[in-house]
Structure formats: structure tokens, C-alpha cells
Amino acid sequence: MGGCSTRGKRPSALSLLLLLLLSGIAASALPLESGPTGQDSVQDATGGRRTGLLTFLAWWHEWASQDSSSTAFEGGTPELSKRQERPPLQQPPHRDKKPCKNFFWKTFSSCK
């Protein structure tokens, strides 16, 4: 509302939320350590998925932070300046409303 733009902060907050969500999903998908230990191939596949997920999240976080830093150097977004240039929306004049009619045989009221 003021002169500050919160657009640059949204990608980092969104990336943190996505990071928490995906790390929770990845942690719940991992096998428990107290289970059978003879499943080396399953653990290798899980480790590969985890590495791929972490690589993707690191890339995505870097991309989101580059996006937010580039908008900070541009001097704001053009949409914000267009909004500030427009006059505020004018509301139509308030009309006198008739009182609502309550129809006892129906389940609704009629307001015109």
C-alpha cells in the first residue's frame, strides 16, 4: 500500500514453503531405519531420489532469488506504477433499498 513493494519477498517465502513441503514428503517416503537392513538397492534408489530432489530445490531456490533480485534493480514493477497512476474506483451512488420480504412458506427472503 505504501511505497514498498512486497513482490520481491514472495518468491523466497514461496520457496521456503515449497522446500518445507517437499522435505516433509521426502522424509515420509524414506524407509524407517528400524526396518530390515538387507535392502541396499532400495536405499540406493531412495538416496538417488533424495539427491535429485535436493538438486532441484537448490536450482529452484537460486532461480527464485535471481528473479526477486532482478525486480529489485528494475525499480519496481510496471503494474504497481499503473495502479498508482489510476484514480481510485468510484462506487455507484447508494440507492434506497426496499426492505426485504420474508416469505414464510419459502426458505428464503426476497430483497430488491
From Swiss-Prot:
User: What family is this protein classified in?
Assistant: Belongs to the somatostatin family.
Q: Which is one Gene Ontology cellular component term of this protein?
A: extracellular space
According to its UniProt entry, the protein's GO biological process terms are:
adenylate cyclase-inhibiting G protein-coupled receptor signaling pathway; neuropeptide signaling pathway; regulation of cell migration; regulation of circadian sleep/wake cycle, sleep
Cite the residue spans of the region called Disordered: 66-101
Positions annotated as pro-peptide in this chain are: 28-81
Signal sequence, start to end: 1-27
Q: What does this protein do?
A: Neuropeptide with neuronal depressant and sleep-modulating properties.
Q: GO MF terms on file?
A: G protein-coupled receptor binding; neuropeptide hormone activity
Organism in which the protein naturally occurs: Rattus norvegicus (Rat)
Q: Which gene encodes it?
A: Cort
Record-linked InterPro entries: Somatostatin, Somatostatin/Cortistatin_C
PANTHER family noted in UniProt: CORTISTATIN, SOMATOSTATIN
Q: Name one Pfam family in it.
A: Somatostatin
According to its UniProt record, in which tissues is this protein expressed? Interneurons in the cerebral cortex and hippocampus.
Which keywords describe this protein according to UniProt? Cleavage on pair of basic residues, Disulfide bond, Hormone, Secreted, Signal
Per the UniProt entry, the disulfide pairs are C100-C111
Superkingdom of origin: Eukaryota
Tagged with keyword Signal: yes
Give the protein's recorded name. Cortistatin
Q: What is its main location?
A: secreted
Q: Coiled-coil segments, which residues?
A: none
Spell out the subcellular localization from the entry: Secreted
